[in-house]
């Protein structure tokens, strides 16, 4: 227990919520790690600590024996995904291959092969600007760099807008806050973290969307 520092600079955050795992990997304490992600808990610490991670599709890696007592995730399970963390993309891929698959204790887990159909001319959409939001120059440059790598490998790159990003966030918040905190066992977090999560949950109380409407909207957006 104790404060987790960013191994590159103690004045900077290691990110979260899987910041401890990311810091351990970046500092050489561990070659590989496992975390979970609802809204960035794998991806945020990965970019803060300079390692590799991803949020797989829900069910790709079975969610068992990770957070004690949190196997029954309720509606939070719609977003909750287990994922690997590593110092390189190659290590990340190998870890994902090892962990993926069906597990009897996770009804959302699935067995799907990784060598599925790949389009002859794969496409990727990139977003470099968001309405009413500022994106740091370094982030835009990283997106452009990734797009160039894909383009050099034969991908078709298309720059698109994301006009409903705030609406998507509100839907995510409404679904997530519909009882998620009740599913977390008592004494899982320290008091300051508990207070932060309570404030986070209160954000959705002013949203006029009902849970049913939010779920319907989520399905509509997934079809677009």
Language-model regions, residue ranges each:
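Short helix-loop-beta junction
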Residues: 143-155
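Short glycine/threonine-rich loop-to-helix capping motif typified by GTGT followed
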Residues: 137-139, 168-178
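Short helix-loop capping/hinge segments that flank enzyme active sites or metal/cofactor-binding pockets
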Residues: 121-127, 174-223
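Short glycine/serine-rich loop segments
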Residues: 1-96
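General small-molecule cofactor/ligand-binding pocket signal
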Residues: 156-161
């Amino acid at each position: 227990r104790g404060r987790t520092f960013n191994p590159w600079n103690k004045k900077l955050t290691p990110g979260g919520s899987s910041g401890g795992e990311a810091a351990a990997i970046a500092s050489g304490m561990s070659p590989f790690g496992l975390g979970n992600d609802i809204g960035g808990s794998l991806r945020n610490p990965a970019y803060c600590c300079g390692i590799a991670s991803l949020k797989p599709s829900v069910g790709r890696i079975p969610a068992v024996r990770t957070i004690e007592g949190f196997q029954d995730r309720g509606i939070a399970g719609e977003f909750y995904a287990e994922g690997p963390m590593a110092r390189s993309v190659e290590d990340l891929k190998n870890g994902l291959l090892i962990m993926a698959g069906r597990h009897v204790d996770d009804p959302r887990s699935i067995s799907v092969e990784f060598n599925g159909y790949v389009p002859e001319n794969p496409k990727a959409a990139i977003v470099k600007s968001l309405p009413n939001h500022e994106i740091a120059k370094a982030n835009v440059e990283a997106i452009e760099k990734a797009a160039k790598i894909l383009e050099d490998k034969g991908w078709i790159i298309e720059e698109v807008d994301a006009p409903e990003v705030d609406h998507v966030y509100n839907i995510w918040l409404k679904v997530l806050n519909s009882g998620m905190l009740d599913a977390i066992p008592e004494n899982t977090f320290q008091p300051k973290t508990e207070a932060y999560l309570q404030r986070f949950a209160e954000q959705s109380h002013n949203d006029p969307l009902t849970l049913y409407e939010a779920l319907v909207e989520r399905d509509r957006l997934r079809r677009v």
